[in-house]
Amino acid sequence: LWDIKAKRAGKPLWLLLGEMEPEELVSTLDFRYMTDALTPAEAVEILREGQKGKAERIKHLLEVGYPGYSTAPGWLGYSDEKMVALAKEETQVKGFKQIKLKVGQNIDDDLRRLAKAREAIGPDVRLAVDANQVWDVPTAIDWINKFHDFDLAWVEEPTSPDDVIGHATIARAINPIKVATGEQMQSRILYKQYLQANAFG
């Protein structure tokens, strides 16, 4: 329905939502099971605080676009040469400022691939990794802590997406590398618990 409303208004959905007043936007949300972490009044206050500089941010997004990242070079099974070539193409030709590599099958392969990727993209392009839930918590911590030399922006799905406490434990242990969840978040309750536990950042 939101997509239809945005199309009727002749604007992208992000802009339609961004132009709403905080109270109007919050009134569209269901806060059931959430108010121990965030009340509607607190949400309005957060959004009201975000109004500062909003016009400039919208102008920037309309002119430049929203920053994305490329997963093209990051698939497991690519030769080092193919991964490096794709990393250079995505960043130097297509202009991506971040790439993401899959990791988690073999630590030596991961270290080699990350070193080659970082060399190919240079220090100014962000590099992230995605483990696709392959590790338990101790393995994730051990493995990711070997990645600090590559200046990672974040690691996605280091363990089961249902393990909120595990993600929080990992996040504390690998700091300053951030933890991200993927597309597997099952409910707003889990999302709330992630926020309460500082399990991603």
Language-model features: where?
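Glycine-/acidic-rich phosphate or pyrophosphate-binding loops and their flanking alpha/beta elements
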Residues: 57-59, 167-170
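Glycine-enriched alpha-helix->loop->beta-strand junction motifs that scaffold or abut catalytic
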Residues: 95-97, 121-123, 145-153, 171-179, ...
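A short acidic, amphipathic alpha-helical/loop segment
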Residues: 116, 166-169, 193
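Beta/alpha (TIM)-barrel catalytic core signal, keyed to glycine-rich beta->alpha loops juxtaposed to Asp/Glu
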Residues: 187-195
